[in-house]
């Protein structure tokens, strides 16, 4: 097929055009090592092969074998001159498929002085559902939290969600994709999800749909563009008046409204971690998203707000308008053997404007849990504790966090870690009903940082890393001034977190 002689062990499992797109090597072109490396990367990026080997053998050219000897190298549209001397190469590519279907189970648990929590996700994946290396994913998530507070009116919180996605190994666009020839490993992912949440003070349904384009331009860099990102937050049980009655914070009140979120996002990732997990490595993640701008422009041009309301609506639902961005930079330094020192810096900011007075609750930042400040679940804004202590809702517009972790082998598949976490969240502006201390200020934020240490165990069971972290608070900015440094050990100042995979 277009210069490829494809041999299958049994029945054809991948359509020839898919393999042709992944192998930029053509007959009668000069050998090019970068194209060979790209062929290997593109084959593995399909997600269908467990391994791929590219082997070359010399084959002298003779007049009667011109049509069966293949040159390896430049792409079909290359202007390179044909190699006309002896020393021709034959190329054999041996690909071993991985399991077509798989099931994955993720567990995450935590316990603090306030509640116990357990979350489980069961995922199914078909890596070649239409014989074109299309990947179909389906996952089910269930979560349960039990409040320890004896005076809590409702002690349970539950969550159930379904997510499905279909990933194509090419760009799905309504025009010819020839202009994207310089783009490596193009993919398109279509996603749908729905999530039901029943909390002590409210219940809601989260629905989302989106299309994401993903690609790379080098060995370590990856990009994603999500031009369509639609989310609907439906408050199926309005927020309990008792819950809102304790606050006059309009930011919190507006965060729990039925909302329509329509926007776009962009992401960049850099990771030079080697596949065998050896050696030093740097990981960078940057994300930016905005919502409501196009809708807002159309609404202002042709419509007016509904009578008696200040906000514009779409389909009868107020739409959100905001900007959000975050950056994570981590570095792993090997100290010898399997011992490593890993550090991370994280910062994020979100700001509502236009049709919104607050960022949607699910786009706000939180601080605490198994992947952040492991001494808390969660940590509050600035230096002020949230008054709703039997089910704390503690999120903000600004987040700063730093983590340092020493990882070392213990015995066999068991590894240990000692860690330090530093960080907190704040509001970007002052909201009525909240203390001025909850607002981020450069002249005082460093005094409001939470600080914890802790110990962890990691169980490397080949296909996953199970993690158990015990965080111990050292500086709690939620405590009154003069009592923030914790000198006496108390169980209520600790948190036990269970997770799958490394935190960063």
Model-derived features: positions:
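Transmembrane beta-strand segments that form the barrel wall of outer-membrane beta-barrel proteins
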Residues: 22-23, 101-111, 120-122, 133-151, ...
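Residue-level signature of outer-membrane beta-barrel architecture
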Residues: 126-128, 168, 194-196, 213-215, ...
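Transmembrane beta-strands of outer-membrane beta-barrel proteins
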Residues: 103-105, 134-140, 186-192, 207-209, ...
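Residues that define the transmembrane beta-barrel architecture of outer-membrane proteins
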Residues: 87, 116-118, 154-162, 203-207, ...
């Amino acid at each position: 097929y277009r210069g490829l002689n494809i041999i299958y062990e049994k029945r054809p499992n991948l359509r020839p055009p898919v393999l042709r797109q992944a192998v930029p090597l053509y007959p009668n072109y000069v050998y090019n090592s970068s194209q060979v490396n790209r062929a290997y990367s593109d084959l593995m990026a399909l997600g269908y092969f467990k391994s791929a080997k590219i082997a070359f053998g010399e084959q002298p050219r003779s007049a009667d074998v011109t049509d069966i000897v293949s040159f390896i190298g430049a792409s079909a549209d290359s202007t390179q001159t044909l190699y006309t001397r002896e020393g021709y190469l034959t190329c054999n590519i041996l690909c071993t498929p991985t399991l077509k279907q798989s099931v994955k189970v993720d567990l995450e648990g935590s316990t603090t002085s306030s509640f116990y929590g357990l979350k489980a996700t069961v995922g199914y994946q078909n890596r070649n559902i239409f014989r074109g290396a299309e990947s179909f994913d389906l996952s089910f998530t269930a979560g349960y939290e039990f409040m320890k507070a004896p005076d809590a009116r409702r002690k349970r919180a539950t969550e159930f969600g379904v997510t499905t996605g279909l990933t194509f190994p090419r760009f799905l666009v309504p025009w010819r994709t020839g202009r994207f020839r310089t783009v490596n490993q193009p993919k398109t992912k279509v996603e749908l999800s729905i999530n039901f949440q029943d909390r002590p003070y409210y219940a809601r349904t989260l629905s989302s749909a989106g299309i994401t384009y993903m690609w790379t331009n080098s060995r370590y860099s990856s990009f994603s563009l999500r031009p369509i990102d639609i989310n609907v937050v439906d408050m199926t049980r309005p927020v309990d008046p008792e819950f809102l009655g304790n606050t006059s914070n309009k930011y919190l009140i507006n965060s729990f409204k039925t909302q329509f979120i329509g926007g776009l996002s962009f992401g960049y990732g850099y990771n030079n971690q080697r596949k065998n997990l050896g050696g030093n490595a740097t990981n960078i993640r940057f994300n930016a998203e905005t919502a409501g701008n196009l809708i807002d422009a159309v609404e202002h041009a042709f419509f007016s707000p509904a009578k008696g309301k200040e906000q514009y609506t779409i389909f009868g639902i107020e739409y959100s308008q905001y900007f959000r961005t975050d950056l994570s930079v981590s570095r792993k330094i090997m100290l010898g053997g399997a011992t490593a020192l890993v550090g991370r810096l994280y910062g994020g900011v979100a700001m509502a404007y236009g049709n919104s007075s607050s960022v949607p609750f699910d786009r706000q930042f939180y601080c605490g849990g198994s992947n952040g400040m492991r001494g808390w679940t969660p940590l509050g804004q600035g230096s002020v504790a949230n008054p709703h202590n039997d089910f704390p809702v503690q999120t903000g517009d600004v987040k700063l966090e730093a983590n340092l972790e020493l990882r070392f082998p213990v015995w066999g598949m068991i590894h240990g870690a000692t860690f330090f976490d530093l960080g907190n969240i704040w509001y970007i502006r002052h909201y009525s009903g909240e203390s001025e201390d909850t607002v981020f200020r450069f002249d005082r934020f460093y005094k409001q940082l939470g600080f914890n240490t802790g110990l962890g165990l990691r169980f490397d069971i080949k296909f996953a890393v199970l993690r158990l972290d015990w965080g111990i608070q050292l500086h709690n900015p939620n405590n009154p001034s003069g009592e923030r440094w914790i000198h006496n050990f108390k169980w209520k100042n600790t948190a036990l977190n269970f997770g799958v995979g490394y935190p960063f």
